[in-house]
Regions:
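Intrinsically disordered, low-complexity acidic Ser/Thr-rich regulatory segments
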Residues: 1-122, 134, 171-184
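Forkhead-associated
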Residues: 102, 110, 127-175
Length: 184
């Protein structure tokens, strides 16, 4: 698995490339870092979404849904699907000014993958998350310190269910434990 330092290095290289290649990315990145600071785009704790049973549900900004399908290595939204390729890094975010479209930028393309309702209080961040298609076949997800957070829900092939929450400390978490109907 990638070390945090090597993952951050790949993110930094991609930020530089995407800023030169895509005017929409440059505008999103510049306005985001002007608001939150130059070091606001950081790797935190990558989570492996490969070796999972389809789909892994990815929620960005509370209401924007994407689906990762490991059997096809695709990230799916209502507008398009992106094949996650080995060795390619993808940054998820939105344009500035706000146009209600979630974008995936990579060295290969800029793609609109999902719509979101800009009337909600919490929308995806301009620079929100990263997905890395690792050289070894792993697919890693990480929230890049977005102000609106991310949720992953799915099941590994073991099978073992998981829910991962990337959020600021101010976000309240309400967990209701249910009595298990099956063996411990």
């Amino acid at each position: 698995m990638q070390t945090l330092a090597s993952f951050q290095e790949k993110v930094d290289e991609s930020l530089t490339l995407f800023r030169r290649k895509y005017p929409s990315f440059e505008e999103a990145y510049s306005s985001y870092t002007a608001q939150y600071g130059g070091d606001s785009v950081q790797v935190h704790e990558p989570f492996r979404i490969s070796e999972t049973i389809d789909p892994v549900i990815i929620v960005l900004g509370r209401t924007t849904l994407l689906f990762y399908r490991d059997s096809q290595r695709t990230l799916n939204g209502s507008l398009s699907s992106i094949e996650i390729r080995k060795g390619v890094l993808y940054i998820l975010g939105r344009r500035e000014p706000l146009d209600s479209r979630l974008i995936v930028w990579s060295k290969e393309s800029e793609s609109e993958v999902e719509r979101f309702d800009s009337r909600v209080r919490i929308v995806p961040s301009r620079i929100h998350a990263v997905i890395l298609g690792g050289e070894n076949g792993d697919v890693l997800f990480d929230d890049l310190g977005s102000s609106s957070g991310s949720i992953l829900a799915g099941e590994t092939k073991k099978p073992e269910p998981f829910i991962t929450l990337y959020a600021t400390p101010r976000v309240g978490i309400h967990r209701v434990e249910l009595k298990s109907k099956y063996g411990q």
